[in-house]
Swiss-Prot record:
Heterohexamer; composed of 3 copies of TIM8 and 3 copies of TIM13, named soluble 70 kDa complex. Associates with the TIM22 complex, whose core is composed of TIM22 and TIM54. Interacts with the transmembrane regions of multi-pass transmembrane proteins in transit. Mitochondrial intermembrane chaperone that participates in the import and insertion of some multi-pass transmembrane proteins into the mitochondrial inner membrane. Also required for the transfer of beta-barrel precursors from the TOM complex to the sorting and assembly machinery (SAM complex) of the outer membrane. Acts as a chaperone-like protein that protects the hydrophobic precursors from aggregation and guide them through the mitochondrial intermembrane space. Transmembrane segments: none annotated. Belongs to the small Tim family. One of its GO terms (biological process) is protein insertion into mitochondrial inner membrane. One of its GO terms (molecular function) is protein transporter activity. The twin CX3C motif contains 4 conserved Cys residues that form 2 disulfide bonds in the mitochondrial intermembrane space. However, during the transit of TIM8 from cytoplasm into mitochondrion, the Cys residues probably coordinate zinc, thereby preventing folding and allowing its transfer across mitochondrial outer membrane. This is Mitochondrial import inner membrane translocase subunit TIM8. It is found in: Mitochondrion inner membrane. The gene is TIM8. Disulfide bonds join 44-68, 48-64. A motif (Twin CX3C motif) lies at residues 44-68. Pfam families: zf-Tim10_DDP. The keyword Ribonucleoprotein does not apply.
Length: 87
């Protein structure tokens, strides 16, 4: 990471400031997605995996995980669409 003097931020053009703001918004959005994925993984793992005794999932565990993740993804898609429609 570069060492940027905070005073230099005032020297940026409006276009550069908008570009930086857009970049930061995109990075924040990516972080939110990563956080959601981590939460889904944790919740679904706890819900579907009762014990880890080898490197394979049972067919029931695979089905549970797929269903769990799909349910969260469907819910998120609906929430995002609802937010987009309300804007």
């Amino acid at each position: 990471m570069s060492n940027l003097n905070p005073g230099e931020l005032g020297d940026l053009t409006d276009a550069s400031k908008k570009e930086i703001a857009a970049y930061l918004d995109a990075e924040n959005s990516k972080q939110k997605v990563r956080t959601s994925i981590n939460q889904f993984t944790d919740i679904c793992f706890k819900k579907c995996i009762s014990r880890v005794d080898n490197g394979n999932l049972s067919s029931q565990e695979e089905e549970c995980l797929a269903s769990c993740v799909n349910r969260f993804l469907d819910t998120n898609i609906r929430v995002v669409r609802g937010l987009q429609n309300s804007q």
